[in-house]
């Protein structure tokens, strides 16, 4: 995969944008496959992600609201399931998504139901396996996603993967 971004000209070496830019360097792609930006409402999370998205030096990228991405993903999975020969539907969805975008930026990531959580775990594994970088904003830290949801224990592997693969 070609280098994801050019070095942003920043005065402070340790600033957030500097770290965001540095994660995209080729030598770090193997280790960090994304960034998860969380904080309170109106703190500038979306603005930081938009700055990164605007300055990243790749063409096959997508920025969307997380809710819209999940709606598109459920539609895609529904279409894939029509083909009985495909066994691992979320992985196949990840393959199709990765053919269109090597960088996915999600605004306002949240988990509202167990169906989304179960799909995301397998989908994100497939995306990361194919070299897709994920940048997401959220009002909650990963550990608080789907905090009081039904069968939350099934979401914990996804949260662990999110923490392992993303700079939080």
Show where each model-derived region lies:
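Walker A (P-loop) phosphate-binding loop of P-loop NTPases
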Residues: 42
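AAA+/P-loop NTPase substrate/partner-engagement loops
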Residues: 54-84, 92
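Conserved lysine of the Walker
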Residues: 45
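Phosphate-binding P-loop
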Residues: 7-17, 23-32
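Hydrophobic anchor at the beta1->P-loop junction of P-loop NTPases
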Residues: 37
């Amino acid at each position: 995969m070609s280098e994801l971004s050019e070095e942003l000209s920043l005065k402070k070496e340790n600033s957030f944008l500097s770290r965001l830019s540095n994660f995209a360097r080729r030598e770090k792609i193997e280790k960090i496959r994304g960034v998860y930006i969380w904080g309170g409402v109106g703190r500038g999370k979306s603005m930081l992600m938009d700055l990164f998205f605007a300055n990243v030096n790749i063409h096959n990228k997508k920025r969307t609201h997380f809710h819209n991405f999940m709606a598109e993903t459920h539609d895609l999975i529904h279409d894939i399931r029509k083909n009985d020969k495909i066994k691992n539907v979320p992985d196949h969805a990840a393959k199709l998504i990765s053919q269109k975008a090597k960088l996915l930026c999600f605004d306002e990531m949240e988990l509202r139901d167990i169906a989304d959580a179960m799909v995301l775990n397998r989908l994100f594994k497939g995306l990361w396996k194919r070299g897709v970088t994920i940048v997401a904003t959220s009002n909650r830290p990963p550990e608080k996603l789907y905090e009081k949801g039904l069968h939350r224990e099934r979401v914990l592997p996804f949260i662990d993967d999110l923490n392992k693969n993303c700079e939080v």
